[in-house]
Amino acid sequence: MAKKNAIQDFSGEIGIAALVVAVVALMVLPLPTMLIDALLGLNITLSVVLLMVTMYIPSATSLSAFPSLLLFTTLLRLSLNIASTKSILLHADAGHIIESFGKLVVGGNLVVGLVVFLIITTVQFIVIAKGSERVAEVGARFTLDAMPGKQMSIDADLRAGHLSPEEARKRRALLAMESQLHGGMDGAMKFVKGDAIAGLVITLVNILAGIVIGITYHNMTAGEAANRFAVLSIGDAMVSQIPSLLISVAAGVMITRVSDEEQAHKQSSLGMEIVRQLSTSARAMFTASALLMGFALVPGFPSFLFVALATLIFVFGYTLRNRAKEGDGDEGDALPALLREGSKGKAPTIAEQAPSFTVPVGVRLGAELAKGLDVPALDTAFQQGRHALAEALGLPFPGIAIWKADALQPDSYEVRVHDIPGEPVAVPDGHLLIPDLPEALRAQAVEAAGLPNHPAPHWIAPAHVAQDAALSATGQRVERVIADHVVHVLRRSAHLFVGLQETQWMLERVTTDYPGLVAEAQKAVPAQRIADVLRRLLEEQVPIRNMRAILESLVVWGPKEKDTLMLVEYVRGDLGRQIAHQATGGTRQMPAILLDLSVEQTVRQAIKPTPAGNFLTLDPQQVEAIIMRLRGIMQGNPVETPSALAIVTSMDIRRYVRRMIEPHLQALNVYSFQELGGYVDLRPVGKLVL
C-alpha cells in the first residue's frame, strides 16, 4: 500500500510538472496541427472529468485542490488559444478539431456562427462566471466570520467530552481546509471570469487579423479571407469556450454545494441530494401535475405532451406519498422514550440481538412476549415513567435498550443493569397484573415473581377483571408492567447512572440560567468530584433537581472540605429543607431512633483514614448487637411504612451508620441533626444503647 501511494504521489508530481512545461511550450514553440488536435482533445477531457468529479464528491472539502486545478486548466486553455492562433494566422490551418467545430457551428452561415459564439460567451461570462464569483465571495466572507465560533464549539465539545482529542484535531484541520478552500475559490473565480473575456477578445482579434493577413499575404479576396479565417477563428473559440463553460459549471457546482453532515458521511453525490430533496413533498408533485393539466387545456398547446407530463408527475407524487406512509409505519415501531437524555440519535426499536457494548439498562424479551407487545403503548408507558423519574429525582434518563433473547422463556422478560441480570418475570399470555390482589381472588390468579415494586402482585385473566370495577381500574397490561419495573430499578439504582458525562450535561443545562454559578462551581470543585457528590446524594434517594442549591453549596464548602464524604454532608445540610419535607411528607413529624453518646463515640473511633478514603472498622459482633437492638426498637414501635421511622445522629458519623445498617435494614433511613435542623419535630421512640 505504501509503495502504491508513493507511485501515485510521484506520478502526480510528474504530471503537474509536465503540464507547466507544456503550458510554457505552447506559448513559445510552433506546434504541428496533429499535436494541437491532441491537446485540444485533452483539454475537453479534463473539463468533462472535472465536471463529473465535482458532481459526485460528498462535500466541497473533498476536492480542496480545485482552485489550483482552475488555475492550471485556465492557463492550458489560454496557451492552446495562443498556439492555435499562431497556426491559424501563419498557415490558415489549425487541425481537424478546430475546422470541424467551425463548420458545425457556422453551418454555412457566418452570422449564425458569430451569434452562437456570442450567446455561449455571454451565458458563461454574465450568468455562470458572474454568479459563481459572487457566491464564492460571499461564501469566503461568511466562512471567515464563522471560523471563531466553530473553533470555540470544537473546544467546548472537547472539554465536555463529546469529542476525543483526535476527533478535535481532525475537525480543526477540516475547518482550516474549508476556510482555505473558500478563500482560494474566491480568487480562482477571477480566472474563470477573465478566461471568458480573453476568449472573446482573442476571437475578435483572430477574425480581424485573419482577414488582413488573408488579403495581404495569401492574395485572397475579402470574402474568401473572411470565410476562411472566420470559420477557423469561431471553431477555435468554440473549442476553447465549451471546456471553459464546463469548468465554469464545475466551479459553480463546487461553491454552491451544501451538504449536511449526515449525507456527507453517506458519501452522497449531487444527483442523489437533488433527488432526495426534491422528493420530500408529494403535495408539490400533485400541484405541479394539476398546473400541467391546465397547460394542456390552453388552445394551441400540444395537449398530448402536457397530459403525458402531468400523468408522469402525478404517478411520481403518488409513489412518494406511499413511501412516506410506509416510513410512518416503520416509525410506529420506534421507541423515542428509550433515548438517553440529550441524545439526538435515532429512536431505538426492539432489536433482534443484544447491543455490541454494555448499556446502562437493558430489557431482554422472550420471543412470544416480544411478538405480542403493543409498541406505541410501551413507548407511552416509558414516556410517563421517565417524566416521573425526572420529577422525583432529577436523574438524567440513561437510555434503555430492548432486545429479543431466545435464551429466555418465550413468555418472560428480564431487566439488566450494566449487564447484571435481575430475576426473570414470567407473563402469562393475555393476563393483566393486579399490584395488590385481594385474598379472595388469589385462587383464580397466578403469583407474579420478580416484581420488587409491588407488595403482592398477581396475574389474572381479563375475564375475571371485567367482573370487578375496582380490579379493572388497577389492572395493568404487560407494557405498563415492564415500564414500571424498569423505572423502579432506575429509582433504586439511580446513583449507578450518573457519571462524568451526565454531570457535564446537567452543568450545560444549568449554564443556560446560571452561567456564573456554574463557572464558580467548576473552579471550586472538579467535574469528577461534582459527579461523586451527585452519586452519593442519589444513593440515598436525595433528589438532585435543585442544582442551583447544590452548586452554591459546593462553591462554599468545596475549597474548605477535601473529604468527599463530609462535603456531601455539608451539601445535605444546605438541602435540609428539601430532605426534611421528603422524609416527613410535609407533616414535620418524624418518629426517630436516637443513638446514645457512647454508641456515637464508638462509631467515631472506629472510622479509620486510609489513602483510598475513610472506612468504618467496627467489630462484627458490635455491628450485630447494634442491628439486634435496632430491630427490637422497630418491633416495639410499629409504623405504617418502614421508611417513616429513621435514625437521627451527628453529621460526622451519619454516613458510616447508614453504611453499617444498610445490608440489614435497607428501609431504615439515617439523618443528621444538622440537616433536619428546625424543619422537623422529632418524636424519639427509642435510644440505642450498647
UniProtKB/Swiss-Prot annotation:
Top-level taxon in the UniProt lineage: Bacteria
Coiled coil segments of this chain: none
UniProt keyword list: Cell inner membrane, Cell membrane, Hypersensitive response elicitation, Membrane, Plasmid, Protein transport, Transmembrane, Transmembrane helix, Transport
Record's GO cellular component terms: plasma membrane
Entry membrane topology: Multi-pass membrane protein
Pfam families in the cross-refs: FHIPEP
Ranges annotated as spanning the membrane: 14-36, 48-72, 104-128, 196-216, 229-253, 291-315
A biological process term (GO) from this entry: protein secretion
Compartments where located: Cell inner membrane
PANTHER family the record matches: FLAGELLAR EXPORT PROTEIN, MEMBRANE FLHA SUBUNIT-RELATED, INVASION PROTEIN INVA
Biological function: Involved in the secretion of PopA, a proteinaceous elicitor of the hypersensitivity response in plants.
Family to which the UniProt record says this protein belongs: Belongs to the FHIPEP (flagella/HR/invasion proteins export pore) family.
NCBIfam families: hrcV (TIGR01399)
Protein name (record): Hypersensitivity response secretion protein HrcV
Organism: Ralstonia nicotianae (strain ATCC BAA-1114 / GMI1000) (Ralstonia solanacearum)
